[in-house]
Amino acid sequence: MAKNKSQYDSTLNLPKTLFEMRAGLPKKEPVMLKDWDDNDLYNQLMKHNEGKPQFILHDGPPYANGNIHMGTALNKIIKDIIIRDKNMEGFQAPYVPGFDTHGLPIELKALSSVGDKKKDISKLELRQICEKFATEHIDIMSDQFKRLGVIGDFEHPYLTLKPEFEARQIEIFGEMAKKGYIYKGLKPVYWCPDCRTALAEAEIEYGEDDCDSIFVRFHVSQDPNGVLAKHGIPMDKTYFVIWTTTTWTLPANEAICLNGQFEYSFVKIGDEFHIMATELVKSVMDACHIENYEIVGEPVPGTEFELMRYNHVYLPKEGWVILGDHVTLESGSGCVHTAGGHGVDDFNVCQKYPQVPITVPVDDGGYLTELAGKYAGQRVWAANKTILADLTESGAVMGQVHIKHQYPHCWRCHHPIIFRATEQWFCSIAKFREDVYKAIDTVTWMPDWGHDRMKGMVRDRNDWCISRQRTWGVPIPAFYCKKCGTYHITDATIKAVSDLFRKEGSDAWYKYEAEQIIPAGEVCEKCGASEWTKDTDIMDVWFDSGSTHAAVLEERPELRFPADMDMEGGDQFRGWFQSSLLTSVASKGCAPYKSVLCHGWVVDEQCKQMHKSAGNGVEPSEIIKDYGADIIRLWVASSDYTVDVRAGKNIFKQLSEAYRKIRNTARFILGNLDGFDPNTDCVADDQLQEIDRWALAALDDLMVNTSAGYAVYDFNKVYHAVYNFCVVAMSNFYLDVTKDRLYCTNGAGRKAAQTTMYKILVALDKIIAPILCFTSQEIWDFMPKTEGMNKYVVFEEMPKAGQYAADEAFKAKWAQLIAVRDEVKKVLEQARAEKVIGASLEAAVTLYCNDAVYDLLNSIPMDELADLMIVSQVELVKGEGGAASAVEGLGVAAAHATGEKCERCWKYSSSIGSHAAHPTLCARCASVVEA
């Protein structure tokens, strides 16, 4: 009701509350955070829920090297909503945040910080700088997470650099080594020349690069099987044609691989013959822009060419022709340039031919060595151009095409990587792959496509390269015999290293000599010697984070193994989800989690990836400054986070409007609960009006929907249910209809409405508490309390559906009453347009009804029916009349109400002036004022 200057204003029960319309969250939230810290909210919550069933959400550790971004905020808020909800659903749900603290980015930052001195500092000094950098960022990120409203044990997070963590990680390594899953060997691995270290598959990202696709011919030098002579082909004029996009690998060429299942043809160009797959002749000739050629003789099976020899294109050596199933007809020539030192398929096929050497003419920094001949000293990317130019000049290049293709890059420095065969430590996935498949089947994957995605990744992956040639990390706990070089790992050495790390941390590896660490009495299994050196590599950081199931879940008393849930972004299928799964299955034989929940990426409003250079990013700090953290939390809840989530200033502006409607619903109720004491003023259910019971039934439906949403972590469903309840059921209907009862009366009707609103607000506030953690607490602080209610809303139990449920007949009745109301509103709008009425209280409505509609409407007292329509007078007439409506058997007519307008309630009534002392009031208002 609008404010009306009148002598009777003071007699109205207008809403009154200190709960502000403007949220002011950026200022209020820090005050609440201080209160939560001062009162140790998290630990008090854990104590409050002690003895209840546990729900363990295991935190995947973010990397401790920078400020949080919107993706991090999305991740942490989803987790916090789950944690808060579970603690309100009858569980004790602890949250131990973690941080991934080792690895290359921090090491590079540390090296950058010392400038020119980096060549002079020791490994131990570098590690100390790295630890300081990581620790500082842990504090920064923890504060930023807490600013988002995330509750957890931030005073005691788990850190992968802690001695007890490193010790347990060494034990996991030892358990896997004991089972034969860890080995050292020469294999091609992803190698970053800029970071000078091996990389795992999880550390690779793909980006578009330009390159030259070239066809190169190699001259046949030996034909031990007499294939050429058999077909009348002169060997001195015959070539194998290969295709490659990595020109720099040609110095490493030791073989050409054909497929024994394919047929090959001799293609005559001029007086020279070129061998290529029969099915690819035309595509090769087209690519090389060769029009005049001739296929000579019949096709020859690929098997006949095995073990022929050819001359290298520029080096003084011969290569071998070999066979491999990996050769396809999808592109190229059917003759594959094979450099076992620079490709997995190449390496594997070369292992079948002992006579084919593995050559690696590239050093750690990506520079060609003396094995590359005249190109030694050139970086591989530059060598692409010079080698191509020289081979073109010599006539070895038959054709070239400049192409764009997806090429692997290092996810740390974002530069292109290479394949390079080096001695590395590996985890042999093949030895326990079937066990991993079985473990995957025991996990609940959300969304369910996660099951097939993980299984496919495990099926397709190679052995896991777990060693890195860097300093900042957990050392590989291996010793080497000084005499014969054999590596040495035993139960005793693992225990010695683990005990040392638990006592002094992994820095101890760099403080002591091998003889000071390895237990006395250890001898080399191969030669019996007992003098040792230490391994110089560190473990892949994915082995660090992949060990959390042991180092955290099994070690922290408030946690347990396995976790009920791991929840991270989709990129973690190749990262933490997978590394945890592999180490857990390898060491324990089971998955480390019962369920996995996956979220998408955060993109801009046009669904494009956010980049600083593009200027399309938004930072959590900016949104918090403008709107408050609760708006970010509402953004998370309003999104379908199982796919990519859009974020932008326009989106947050729209969400702030949605938030305002939820907030104002609570504010209206709080205003009308002024002076209401739920301990003494609540009325019994039989004193409620039907519309009150309808409102509580709508609340019960809300409980059903939000409970279902929370149960499957569908917060989007929770948000929409809450928003629709506040806007449609409450603001647009119930709260509007009850205004007259609330403002203008003091009796049982008002108490019934207040009782209803109180029950609604208590339940609604609990429902929104996991999402709007700050606003819900603010509402809770202003809410009148009954005995036994907690100081903090998160300590309360989530309301259970069923206590206000209505039967289907009641719901159907009120659905029809609301439909009638909607039809009345249409007619009132028309009357307003025709200037018959202004406000709806100026109207008198006549409802023409058939028997069924008449009985429906007549079951409601006429004054309540008028309030339902927000008009002054309602008349029911059996029969036809008025404007036809969408409700069968109903006609509606509107006229100006009879009588005069009451100065206090603004309704029109013929009873105005019936009380001499109050000539401008209706009889009802006069009696209220006189009471």
Where are these regions (language model features)?
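Residues immediately within or flanking Cys/His clusters that coordinate Zn2+
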Residues: 189, 407, 478, 521, ...
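Acidic, turn-prone loop/beta-hairpin segments
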Residues: 100, 189, 193, 199-207, ...
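Residue patterns forming the tRNA-binding/recognition surfaces of aminoacyl-tRNA synthetases
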Residues: 2-25, 31, 35-39, 111-251, ...
